[in-house]
A protein has these predicted regions:
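Flexible inter-domain linker/hinge segments
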Residues: 2-54, 238-241, 245-325, 333-335, ...
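Conserved phosphate/anionic-ligand binding catalytic regions in large, soluble enzymes, centered on
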Residues: 55-75, 192-196, 450-462, 467, ...
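Iron-sulfur cluster-binding cysteine motifs and their immediate structural context
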Residues: 312, 336-356, 382, 387, ...
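Conserved small/polar residues in nucleotide/adenosyl-binding loops
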Residues: 498-502
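Mobile "lid/hinge" segments at catalytic clefts and subdomain interfaces of large enzymes
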Residues: 218, 487-492, 496-497
Length: 502
């Protein structure tokens, strides 16, 4: 149900103070159609009990953030006399979507049945949220702490933070920290699992309990959880706990952030005008978990919940830490990597002479195999849509693909966009009913909200390549109704008949 913050409740009392209050009203929405909504009282008075510490964590579904926060609440609950409240908020994606953890700790009973929006501590566990401009730091109280997990230097961080965030940080004396849990996890041997490192960093910065005690209790919990897996695994977790304490870096906030330079104009979107408008007006704020700020009038053209199809291609979530890069010399052009890709983010193309000339100069090309023909071959990756599952590497028989940092592949996004928009089927290509030939067909399901490496979307995407628009989809409730029909971000690129028993 919709969150009811104190600002909405105070709005009711403010309305009742009037000589002629509205006999009918709504709260929690901006109703500019019937004009029955009450304006929220901002800033709302702090209603939490004195001494309550409020913390908010922005994570990525499947990255361990929620699990780590549940573990933190257990440690604090078992070893202190504090009251605890924990609530976990999710978007409509499976793994790889936004998770927001709301944690409260205090010496008095906690009676706050609403999201945290005046936090003592906010953590961003995925740097893509900073790049996309999510409103995170705006929920930090003046003088509070904002921690970002990223691989950036202070100068690079300044480049990625938008003007609104910089000004809020400077004007409200926000204590800004970064931690590179991404590289630390790889160095320790934990791969993508940054949650333990970030959990100990939280204990260091949030001052909920003495850090030495927190480290001791975290290590005891790790011993209990992983003891059966051997001393090496336990020791790895010990190193991660210590790393989180030691790797926190304080960023000195420049005075210039109080008057930051304006952000560059947003990139111009291409596509059907009605889709572009829907993306700008609805999809972008919804994707940033800011949909509650939209007025009722924003949905005037969508009263029945129908949205333009193909909008998932505009999300460009950029959540993968590592993405594939293709080695043209090693590749045997079997197309198996594209065949197994769950999100249609790696695709083969054959280019004629004119398409080669018009392609971006960084396009990697190879002669067709087993013998050279009139076309050039390429395997292209969309780094901002890839989920980083690595299935393409697993299936490649010759090691022609490797995973590299996403930011190193930024120049390949224009290549992918050009190929999708301008390069199509050619005469003489392999048959559609083969693994290789099917992957030259345009998928009609792309960039869905399924889990990284999901086999279900691989099958569904393949069917659209084999049968195209000659389809009727009868869908049972489950994962497929979540990744296939989320509000405003449809992964289907054509208007298919779609029924569900949801």
């Amino acid at each position: 149900s919709k969150d009811t913050p104190p600002s909405s409740v105070f709005a009711i009392y403010k309305e009742l103070e009037k000589d002629a209050p509205k006999p009918r009203f709504t709260i929690g929405i901006v109703d500019d159609v019937t004009n029955l909504s009450l304006p929220e009282v901002k800033p709302a008075p702090i209603t939490s009990a004195e001494g309550t510490v409020e913390c908010k964590f922005w994570g990525l579904g499947g990255d361990g953030t929620v699990g780590a926060n549940k573990n933190s609440t257990k440690i604090i609950g078992d070893h202190t006399d504090k009251y605890i409240q924990a609530y976990f908020q999710y978007d409509s994606k499976k793994t790889g979507g936004v998770t927001i953890s709301h944690l409260r700790f205090g010496d008095k009973p906690i009676k706050s049945p609403y999201y945290i929006n005046q936090a003592d501590f906010v953590a961003c566990h995925n740097p893509s949220y900073v790049v996309k401009g999510y409103k995170m730091v705006q929920d930090v109280k003046p003088g509070g702490v904002f921690m970002i997990n990223c691989q950036w230097s202070d100068e690079e961080l300044a480049h990625h933070l938008n003007a609104e965030a910089k000004k809020y940080i400077a004007d409200n004396n926000i204590q800004l920290y970064t931690i590179n849990a991404i590289d630390k996890a790889i160095e320790i041997g934990m791969g993508k699992r940054t949650n333990t490192i970030l959990q100990s960093a939280f204990f260091k910065l949030a001052n909920v309990m003495p850090i030495d005690d927190a480290v001791e209790f975290m290590k005891a919990a790790a011993k209990k959880s992983y003891g059966k897996k051997g001393d090496a695994v336990v020791e790895m977790n010990y190193k991660a706990i210590d790393a989180g304490v030691d790797a926190v870096h304080k960023v000195e906030v420049p005075a210039s952030w109080s008057n930051p330079e304006a952000d560059p104009a947003p990139k111009e979107l291409t596509g059907r005008p009605e889709t572009v408008k829907m993306v700008r007006d609805l999809m972008e704020p919804i994707s940033k978990m800011d949909g509650d700020s939209l007025p009722v009038s924003a949905f005037a053209k969508n009263p029945d919940g129908q949205f333009e199809h193909g909008a998932a291609a505009y999300e460009k979530r950029g959540t993968a830490v590592t993405v594939p890069t293709w080695d043209a010399e090693k590749c045997i052009q079997c197309n198996q990597c594209a065949f197994v890709c769950s999100h249609a983010t790696i695709r083969p193309f054959m280019l004629d002479e004119a398409e080669v000339k018009a392609a971006p100069e960084q396009t990697k090309l190879a002669d067709t195999k087993p013998k050279a023909g009139e076309y050039k071959y390429t395997m292209s990756v969309s780094p901002l849509d890839c989920m980083g599952c690595g299935e393409c590497i697993t299936v490649c028989p010759v090691g022609a693909i490797e995973m590299v940092p996403q930011e190193s592949q930024a120049d390949q996004q224009p290549v992918f966009d050009y190929l999708v928009a301008n390069v199509g089927k050619k005469p003489g290509m392999p048959a559609d009913n083969t693994v290789k030939g099917s992957q030259f067909n345009q998928p009609l399901l792309e960039f869905s909200g399924s889990c990284a490496g999901c086999a279900e979307t691989s099958y569904a995407r393949l069917i659209t390549q084999l049968f195209g628009e000659h389809m009727y989809i009868s869908n049972a409730t489950g994962c497929s109704s979540i990744w296939g029909g989320p509000a405003a971000t449809s992964p289907y690129t054509v208007c298919l008949l779609y029924t569900s028993d949801a």
